[in-house]
Amino acid sequence: MKVTIKSIWNTVSAWHWDVNEECCGICRMAFDGCCVDCKIPGDDCPPVWGVCNHAFHMHCILKWLNANELQQCPMCRSEWRFKSDEK
């Protein structure tokens, strides 16, 4: 049996998080990258939003909240609560 390849496809894919801000307010790394604790970007290091609409890497804000007695947004100092996906 003889197989002939008539064409070769070169594919490229890209992804990015749908975030209005370019970088995390805590670690200052881009959201399309990853936080300083992660080795590769992706679903293990997603951005999360507070009700104040500030976004941070999930690992960064969790570390911030665990290190601070007051549960406040690092940007505006309002009480930190995770924004729900529900409307």
UniProtKB/Swiss-Prot annotation:
- Keyword Cell cycle annotated: yes
- Which GO terms of the cellular component aspect does the record hold? anaphase-promoting complex; nucleus
Classification via CDD domains: RING-H2_APC11 (cd16456)
Pathway(s) where this gene product acts? Protein modification; protein ubiquitination
UniProt keywords (A-Z) are: Cell cycle, Cell division, Metal-binding, Mitosis, Nucleus, Ubl conjugation pathway, Zinc, Zinc-finger
Describe the task this protein carries out: Component of the anaphase promoting complex/cyclosome (APC/C), a cell cycle-regulated E3 ubiquitin-protein ligase complex that controls progression through mitosis and the G1 phase of the cell cycle.
Which protein family is it in?
Answer: Belongs to the RING-box family.
Q: Know the name of this protein?
A: Anaphase-promoting complex subunit 11
- Name its species: Dictyostelium discoideum (Social amoeba)
